[in-house]
Amino acid sequence: MIEREPRSSAAAVSTDGAARLRAVRSVMLDLDGCVWFGSELAPRAAEVVAELRARGVGVGFLTNISSGTTSHVADKLTRLGIPARDSDVLMPIEALAGHPLLAGSPQVYVLGREEVATAVARVARTTTDDELADLVVVGRDPELHYADLAAALHVLNRGGPLLALNLDTRVPIEGGRIVPGNGAI
């Protein structure tokens, strides 16, 4: 049995953590509920990102939000105090092109904001006719209408698959509040 001497000071932990951090070349940070809460940065988020960058660690940002674009997300980060470029951000909208459900040019009924429909239209044919749609792509839309839900359900009841851009049922926002996420649909 190997016994280790107990760590008695925070300095020892910090030194050990710093040694481990020196081996890290890049990190990907989740945004919603980690780096930010709605329109508020998490405490010390900007300082942590600045420190990582000062140490030469590449910093990228992941989000599974399906509204907006990488440009919107990078602009929001910058506005909140964390300088970011579009290329620093990965979103599910950008991953659509490689999804097997979109191979073969199906007609897609989009349940989501305009930017989701635009992203889908870059890689597949979109339709607003639930009789013609082969599948449903769903992205978060706080202004979702019941008629759109009913149309999407019709596609699914006819056997069309559902491609959800994320499964989060709730999204943490400023003030400790929670709002329904894409997975709630």
Question: Model segments located where?
Answer:
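HAD-like aspartate-dependent phosphatase fold
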Residues: 1-31, 35-185
